[in-house]
Design a protein with these regions (language model features):
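Core catalytic lobe of class I
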Residues: 2-260
């Protein structure tokens, strides 16, 4: 296995069957470049917060622009490897995450939600908070994004339409949809402000009409949220496990079957 992976690395892009359930140890950006396009379902990121933790590694970037540029090096690769149906979670402090927001969205991600993890008063660690000029932070912030598959779907369907020589009117009729004002077809391929991802039922019809075999699971997000859970998590013990790193995340937090 190791020799096979080495050969793959010499040739560049790795084969997913060789790295599934494996840990890639190396420079993040370099290793990301070797992962195939649109092959990753879920990305969980915990980058340096930047000037939050009193450690040398959190002060490597002098300015906001330097930090943002570095983050975009690996975020650009992530936007390439994540599936159209993929999800992304990034840990951080809101006051620094906001520096990344615009760039992340421009890479094709859609902001879905902010998740707050309540770490409790113990997270203050005996610090003197009376001199603070803000409320003491006892939470962990996670931003949840999905990848915007609509532009890809639009281009893909329009190409199939062109290849088959079909008109929008013909497609709408075969879909059993209204044909005035562009019809339902324009929701997927036009410049419609109500642009949307087709339902699974509609996708099946489009497969038959446009003669393609692209599974619905490849273009549409699936959410496995358990009843009773919200975007505030207060059942995670940050102090039960042995801590080897100042921003270490508990195993339970990363094993959230409620979400990912």
């Amino acid at each position: 296995m190791e020799e096979q992976i080495k050969k793959q690395r010499i040739n560049g892009i790795l084969h997913m069957s060789d790295i599934l359930n494996q840990i890639l140890l190396g420079d993040c950006v370099k290793e990301l470049k070797r992962i195939p396009d649109r092959s990753i379902d879920l990305v969980i990121l915990d980058p340096p917060y930047w000037k939050i933790i009193n450690e040398r590694w959190d002060f490597e970037w002098r300015t906001k622009d330097e930090y943002t540029a570095w983050c975009m090096e690996w975020f650009t690769e992530i936007s390439r490897i994540i599936k159209l149906s993929g999800s992304l979670y990034i840990f951080g402090y809101t006051r620094n995450l906001v520096y990344l927001y615009r760039n992340i969205v421009e890479l094709g991600f859609v902001f879905r939600q902010e998740i707050i993890v309540d770490k409790g008063m113990r997270s203050l660690g005996g610090r003197k908070t009376s001199t603070y000029k803000m409320f003491p932070t006892v939470t962990e912030t996670i931003w949840f994004f999905t990848f915007n598959s609509k532009p890809y779907i639009k281009d893909f369907l329009r190409k199939r339409q062109k290849d088959l020589g079909l008109t929008a009117l013909e497609i709408n009729k075969r879909l059993g949809a209204k044909v005035n004002g562009g019809g339902v077809w324009s929701l997927y391929t036009g410049n419609n402000i109500l642009a949307q991802v087709p339902t699974e039922e509609m996708w099946t019809k489009l497969q038959e009409i446009l003669k393609f075999d692209l599974p619905y699971t490849e273009i549409s997000q699936t959410f496995n949220i358990e009843l009773g859970y919200t975007n505030v998590w207060s059942d995670i013990d940050f102090y039960k496990e042995k801590r080897l790193h100042k921003t270490q995340k508990p195993v339970k937090l990363l094993d959230q079957k409620r979400v990912w």
